[in-house]
Amino acid sequence: MTSSGRSSAGRVLAAVTLLGLVGAGAVLGYATFRVWQRGNVDDAPRLAAADAIVVLGAAQYNGRPSPVLKARLDHAIALWRAGRAPFLVTTGGGQEGDLTTEAATGREYAIEQGVPASAILMEDRGRSTQESLEAVAAILEQRGAGATVFVSDRLHMLRVMRIAKDLRIDAYGSPATDSPSDATMARRLEATMHELAALAWYGLTGRPAPDQPAAAART
């Protein structure tokens, strides 16, 4: 190949590489926009009433909710007190060595805040967002529930809603806007990167990322 031919091939390769980088950047930018956009939407005010409020689990410390889990629970309890739905569903299993589960911790906290035990259901085996939502879908079907409000952190909402819709749940989102996971730009960027990776994996495989158990992924 002549030097001019090599130069031409190099320019083509550079152009293709540049186009690939621009395309990847555009996809990443749009995905980031969608994560943030969904997190700023609260569907609860436009619902006359729902059949259930589901709280996505997060870390717990021997029965004490982490600040992130507490923020989610407080928001869900406020929705329940406002008459948005007749019962709560707390979710999340436990990790090896845990004395209890995220769901049980959430249930006890809600009872302490005045929610009757009869108004709380639990999904206590899920170790990822998807596993919890699959179990929740079965609970909702057994109860004949329709419209369901899902509560989690803002940047978690897009993935929650996508999986719920794929499970044919009549899902509506209501993010906990005062979560510590959203308190600083560094935390927001960390959560955004986590969600982009988890969404990409789910889109490619239809399964939760293999290294994302509930307590690690939803601290």
Roles of regions detected by a PLM:
Residues M185-D211:
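A transmembrane-helix-recognition feature enriched in membrane-embedded lipid enzymes
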Residues A50, A209-T219:
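Short linear elements at protein peripheries
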Residues M1, A9-V12, V89, V136, ...:
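Solvent-exposed, charged interface segments at domain starts and junctions
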Residues M1-A48, A217:
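N-terminal membrane-anchoring alpha-helices
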Residues A31-M193:
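A structural signal for short, hydrophobic/glycine-enriched beta-strand patches
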Residues S7-S8, P116, T184, A209:
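Serine/threonine-rich low-complexity intrinsically disordered regions
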